[in-house]
Curated annotation (Swiss-Prot):
Residues 47-63 have a biased composition (Polar residues). GO terms for biological process: Golgi to plasma membrane protein transport; regulation of exocytosis. This is Phosphatidylinositol transfer protein sfh5. The gene is sfh5. Pfam families: CRAL_TRIO, CRAL_TRIO_N. Residues 372-393 have a biased composition (Basic and acidic residues). Its main location: cytoplasm. GO terms for molecular function: metal ion binding; phosphatidylinositol transfer activity. GO terms for cellular component: cortical endoplasmic reticulum; cytosol; endoplasmic reticulum membrane; plasma membrane. The keyword Heme applies. Transmembrane segments: none annotated. Residues 64-75 have a biased composition (Low complexity).
Length: 415
């Protein structure tokens, strides 16, 4: 009876036969196949005497489940890389140069000793404001990581030494030297988007030597105005990363007005001040300019813009727009036209009435004038002498030299 039971238990043999019907030809063959293909069930069948057929079936089902259990750990291992992918943002995966730039950021911050740019604390690649800052420096250097690293390092060192935020917030500048020369406005679109505009009124220079004589003071005043504008860009509040090859909402518009300015002479003081300004702005404020408009520029000065195209990149010069009549400026911004001052074709008050500027203070020498008025005789003589001497000081110079500033200043913050 014990020898006949395996012959009656046909379920296991049938399973094997289904997989290889051409091989199974006899009962003996089924026995050999069962013994060869399923050695484990035979061992367990020997230990179980009450229901061998049932045990064999159970053993087979248990054996079938074992491979699935063995395959589970590899599946878990394959899921680990998927979980690690979010660690590298998409904008880094698409831009290897930007990823390399971020790898260098800790060393850059360490070597410069400063970790703030335009009000943005420099953190890591998961911080949108930080990413936007690095994108600007990388763009300015056409994707060259080494050059971008060098420029960012210099800019950070400069900010540490100069403290431009303090220049804009807590420093006062001479109204006599800089009053009426620079303004800041913010114009809102219907959708709430803001347009930051800086104005440089070169025709407002009263005395060349007074305004440009102290080069360091002039540069600080110019930086203070720029910092006010940068603050209005609100880069530290960014919640998304700008498209490296797309539009950049963190840029400003600049207007240079040359009304009543002559371009015929080059004063050494102006040349030195503007050259220094160009160096500072090119290094410390890359990719912050959207467009630059030169208004009230004489038609004969077209050579100035032709010269710029020789020395500046196409990416920079394409942002320059000369306009001979300043009253046509507002036409360039149809949706903002009413917010522009009347003198520029809009409906708003003059810049002197509605625009912001840097902190200005009267010179210490100004209050001394009333004390001299007590001695009318002496004062009259002095005033007469002064009035006679003024025509001899060539009043045409103030108009001539600021124009050269206009000629050179456009490149100051061109990028």
């Amino acid at each position: 009876m014990a020898d006949q039971q395996p012959e009656k238990t046909t379920a296991p043999a049938t399973d094997v036969a289904d997989s290889q019907p051409a091989v199974v030809t006899s009962t003996d063959t089924r026995k050999e196949t069962t013994e060869t293909a399923e050695p484990l069930p035979e061992d367990k069948t020997e230990t179980t005497t009450a229901q061998p057929a049932v045990e064999t079936t159970a053993t087979q089902s248990g054996t079938a489940e074992t491979p699935a259990e063995v395959q589970q750990p590899p599946q878990a291992e394959e899921e680990k890389p998927v979980a690690q992918q979010p660690e590298q943002p998409a904008y880094l995966a698409k831009n290897p140069a930007l990823a390399q730039f971020f790898e260098r950021l800790p060393a850059i911050v360490s070597s410069s000793g400063h970790a703030e740019m335009w009000g943005v604390p420099l953190k890591d690649s998961n911080d949108a404001p930080t990413v936007n800052v690095l994108i600007k420096f990388l763009r300015a250097n056409e994707g060259n990581v080494k050059l971008a690293e060098g420029q960012l390092t210099k800019a950070l060192k400069w900010r540490k030494e100069m403290n431009p935020s303090a220049l804009a917030e807590s420093t006062s500048y001479s109204a006599t030297k800089f009053g009426g020369l620079g303004y800041l406005t913010v114009y809102k679109e219907a959708n709430g988007a803001e347009n930051v505009v800086t104005w440089n009124i070169y025709g407002g220079v009263k005395d060349i030597n007074t305004t440009f004589g102290d080069m360091d003071e002039f540069v600080k005043w110019r930086v203070a105005l720029m910092e006010l504008a940068v603050k209005e860009l609100k880069m530290a509040e960014a919640t998304s990363v700008i498209d490296y090859d797309g539009e950049d909402p963190y840029q400003m518009i600049q207007v240079h007005d040359y009304q009543n300015v002559s371009f015929l002479r080059l004063n050494p003081a102006i040349k030195a001040a503007t050259k220094k300004t160009i160096e500072v702005f090119t290094t410390a404020y890359p990719e912050l300019l959207r467009e630059k408009f030169f208004v009230n520029v004489p038609a004969i000065m077209g050579w100035m813009f032709a010269a710029m195209k020789v020395f500046l990149s196409k990416n920079t010069t394409r942002k320059f727009h000369p306009i001979s009549n300043g009253a046509n400026l507002a036409r360039e911004f149809p949706s903002l036209k009413d917010q522009f001052p009347k003198v520029y074709g809009g409906s708003a008050p003059a810049l002197q009435e509605g625009a912001r500027t840097v902190n200005l203070s009267q010179d210490e020498s100004a209050p001394a004038a009333p004390e001299q008025s007590k001695e009318q005789t002496k004062e009259n003589k002095e005033e007469a002498a002064q009035e006679e001497s003024k025509p001899e000081s060539a009043p045409e110079q103030p108009k001539a030299d600021p124009a050269v500033t206009a000629q050179e200043a456009p490149a100051a913050d061109a990028k």
